[in-house]
Structure formats: structure tokens, C-alpha cells
């Protein structure tokens, strides 16, 4: 009887140790993704910003894509020039953003805008350098190390803007896949808030790794908007809680949190054992990850 109890205790301790190791492994291997490159310290979505993010040790890079009037993919968070980040070609502040529709501009025109020297109070540590919105192909050619990183490829798309500041989804999706096929990239996750562009990508290639972005609470309702199960969701970090994580784990859907910039918020996300954190300050979150430890969770991965 006592031998049987001893064996049971040994078995329990082995399982407990393995669970603890798996939990720590999951936390230490959680991806840290540079948001728009490394925008806490460098201008967003610029070649210089992507280089800095890689230098700081990110596991992945997040960038945003729009289209110019030549059908080329441009790295930009908006399909126009944001007044908070850019100066016009004459060096003047931008007042009416709608005047500068990237979808109606050539890349030569786009290059004339300076989106790197304007001070932004939200990012006081950001280094000021003259920088323009690059083409996707320029980033890949000028930052070759990026090919080995996981790419979080956010497609800027909004239904009211179809045909105005962007192509319609069917053409947009084929344009993206045709261009990306020219490059040898290690791993791409296509992301969007627009379900229609994700649907078109899924139709063209059901094997694509697709991430549905959402800033709303109630993830089950959001997922019902899609005709397929996405590989992952990208959620505003304040909407993530244990219940949300458990629902997504039961559905075998990955979870990425955006945009997490404070150590305490990073630790909270790590306690949920999610798949990755998207951050403006990669070094800060990488350091937080390296020092974090907690009790084992119930999550499978």
C-alpha cells in the first residue's frame, strides 16, 4: 500500500515538474513583435525602424501595407499622410490629410514627404531622422535580415474606402500575393480588421496563415463574421482576459496582443501564455519576458 502511494506521489511530482517546465518554456518562447518596426524609438514603418527592431532582438516584425497609383505595395499605416507624423514636400505641416491620398499618388510623389523628423508627444524617445514611406520591395532588399523574421503583414483595408483610397478586396488580395511570391520570406501572417480582404486571401490560398484583428470585446461574435476559422486573432490587449484566452485555446486559435508597451501589461499577457506581444518598445518587452516566471496555467500551448 505504502509503495503504491509512494509511486503515485512520484508520478504526481513528475507531472507537476513537466507542467511547470512547459509553462516556463511557453512564456520564454512567446514572440515579441516590433510594432511598425520599432516606433517607440524610431519613425514608424521606415527602413531605419525595421533595422533598429532587428538590432533589438525581435522575433517578428509588424508592418502595414497600402497601395500607390502604380499598383505597388507601400509600407504605411494610413492610405494618406498623417498630420501627426509627416511634413509635406515643402516642409510644411499637413492640415488636410484627405488631400494626400496615396492610392492616387506615384512613388516619386510619395518620396517627397518627410515622415521622420516631426516630434510626436506620444513617443518622446523617438529618434528624429528624415525618412519616407518605402515600397515593400525596398524594405526587403535593403533590410535582408528581415527575411528570416516572422512577418506580421497588416493589410490596411476599410469597406467605405474601397475604390477611393484602396483597391477592392478581390484585386487587392491578388496584388499582395503576386508581389509577396517574388520574395523568399521565412514566415508571413496576413492580418486585417477587414473580414472581406481576409475572405479573399483565404479563397486564393486556404493554406495562408491569417490573423483576424479586433479591438472589440466578445470574440465569439467577431469570429462568426468569418466563413472560416483564422489561424489566430490579434486583440487589443485590454480586451484580453482568462475567459477569452480559454475560449480561443479550446478553438485552437492563436492569440496576439497589441499594442503592449508597459512591463506590467506585458507580464499580465505573459500570465495568459498567449502566442505573442506586439510592441512599440521591443527591448523593454524582451527584457520583461526574460525575467518573468509564474505558476503553471491550464492552457495547452
What are these regions, as identified by a protein language model?
Residues 26-301:
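Phosphate-group recognition and catalysis centered on beta-loop-alpha active-site segments
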Residues 4-12:
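Positively charged n-region of N-terminal signal peptides that target proteins for export
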Residues 23:
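Predominantly soluble domains enriched in secretory-pathway, periplasmic, or organellar proteins
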